[in-house]
Amino acid sequence: MFKLLIPNKYNYVIRPLVRFKSIKSPKSPKPKPTAKLSPNVFSSGKFSQLHNDTSTTNIESKITSFDQLKIFPSVREAMIKEIKSQYNLKGPRHSNIDEIDIKPTPVQIAAIRKINQTRKLKVPNKDLEGMDDAERIQFELQNANEIQKTKVFTVAAETGSGKTWSYLAPLLSKLKSDDMEFWKSDPEGYDNTRKKGQFVKSVILLPTNELVDQVYETLQRANSFELDHKGAPGNFTSFLELPENKTMNITTMKLGQGEAPVRLFRQLETKGPIDVLITTPGKIVAFSKLVNINRPFRVFANVKYCVLDEADTLFDDSFEKNTTDVITHFPKLLDLILVSATIPKVFEKKLSKLFPDQRSLIRVATPSLHKVPRNIKVMTIDADVAPYNGSKPRCLAQALYAISKDGTEPGYVKRIIVFVNEKSEVDGIVESMITKYKVRPEDIVGVSGSVNIRDRKDMLQPFLQPAELIENDDFGSKVKILVTTDLLARGLNFQGVKNVILLGLPRNSVDLVHRLGRTGRMNQNGRVFVIVDKKSKKSWVKGLGNAIIRGLRIG
């Protein structure tokens, strides 16, 4: 695939960082419900943009199964089937997906427990019958207020930790529980509403169309599995035996780029209520321009649950107004769930401004927040030394060649993601690799914001699905290379991608965490190669790999 560029003596000049033995610390006492975050690296200066003063959530190690968590039975079964369907079976350890025991991740344990907590107040020591009229009325009013007030959850966990199902599991459980309670109290009303209701029950907001597609496809897969409901508690049986509940039976819809909002109203008219709408804030704000539809925002009057995925982005300067405007159209909102892999300092300040009473925030933060998983190996390449002599493209070409010949992922097409800082660099790098370094045009694509959404989707497909066998690839590719910017560094699940190259350093620590997080997802191994020169060489770069091994936070 590649022309050999460098004499043999220079082959594989990618130098792994020196690994220093970490100093053993004395045994620590039993952890308390909250723990102070561990030290972090480069936590000062302009590069440092992450907030690291949040306490973490204590996560009980006794929970080792989704069966131990409060999840609606059909949601649990569909979720496990969906996770297994996306599991990477490469390697000798497992030959059959049924051998895989799917366990909840720390963020899934913590978020599901917090979000699914009962809203009802505990009855005081003396029961309701033992209260006088004044006490009973006061308790019932307080209970009603607790049930109806909006709760705000923040869910923060490291990249690749399973955050999508950490909010989907409680969200879908609440939707199904609401349906079951409605059916038990009024079967006829439930059936009529299911067929004719014209409203949206919940909304998931995301910053990019790629993420809208990703979450929508996750829900579509989960909704496609036939369920047997084995082991479901008796109080669920009659509801689960309804004909429509042979699957999870969640109605979903997405509004992405090029999809007119009027589609939502057509679907409501023909198919009834939508359980989950997945879209961007701008799409809902655009409803105000629908002059041919009477009171278009009326369909959101019954929204009870809203998720802001990649919440730090949705509250940055370019999204904040649209995001807050959208939320104001949900008058019956019960749960607002803010999800992110990073808590930037700017985002934390905005949270404090939006919710000055910090008691109104229910925080979930895993101990590994802002840490890069230890299964990611970071290596630096100095473009200033021979044979590169200051040429970062030459350095990149040699790195691509070395990866293609290293003997890993035998039989499969290797996927490599290359990050640059400016979208203006993308096309130039792709052109250089093809014309000067003889990379096949079929093996490399460049994706930036200037590429239309339909083409972007096609170009990204090989990276968003499990690796193909070389013999099955349409172009006979042994590697596929994606050159892109931070546009694609957030949230996207590049399935099983083992190699990421940073062509220079990102602007800040937030972007660094997200770029590193495109590999090593869900406990799989990954490698990151950081190409630096005299302009981008920082003293801490050579210590980054050691910081990861030691479990330090990115500052």
Curated annotation (Swiss-Prot):
Motif range (DEAD box): 309-312
Please, which domain of life does this record's source organism belong to? Eukaryota
Name a single GO cellular component: mitochondrion
Q: Which Pfam families match?
A: DEAD, Helicase_C
Taking the first listed entry, what is the main subcellular location of this protein, grouped into a coarse class? Answer: mitochondrion
Q: Where in the cell is it found?
A: Mitochondrion
Q: Which residues form the Helicase ATP-binding domain?
A: 144-361
Q: Which SUPFAM superfamilies match?
A: P-loop containing nucleoside triphosphate hydrolases
Which reaction(s) does its UniProt entry say it catalyses?
ATP + H2O = ADP + phosphate + H(+)
Q: What is its EC number?
A: 3.6.4.13
What are the boundaries of the transit peptide?
Answer: 1-25
Key words of the record: ATP-binding, Helicase, Hydrolase, Mitochondrion, Nucleotide-binding, RNA-binding, Transit peptide
Annotated Helicase C-terminal domain residues: 395-555
EC category: hydrolase
Q: Which residues bind ATP?
A: A157, E158, T159, G160, S161, G162, K163, T164
Example GO molecular function term?
Answer: ATP binding
- One GO biological process from the UniProt record? maturation of LSU-rRNA from tricistronic rRNA transcript (SSU-rRNA, 5.8S rRNA, LSU-rRNA)
The short sequence motif called Q motif sits at 101-108
Domain remark from Swiss-Prot or TrEMBL: The Q motif is unique to and characteristic of the DEAD box family of RNA helicases and controls ATP binding and hydrolysis.
Similarity remark: Belongs to the DEAD box helicase family. MRH4 subfamily.
Name the job this protein performs.
Answer: ATP-binding RNA helicase involved in mitochondrial RNA metabolism. Required for maintenance of mitochondrial DNA.
**Name of the featured protein:** ATP-dependent RNA helicase MRH4, mitochondrial
Question: From which source organism is this entry?
Answer: Candida albicans (strain SC5314 / ATCC MYA-2876) (Yeast)
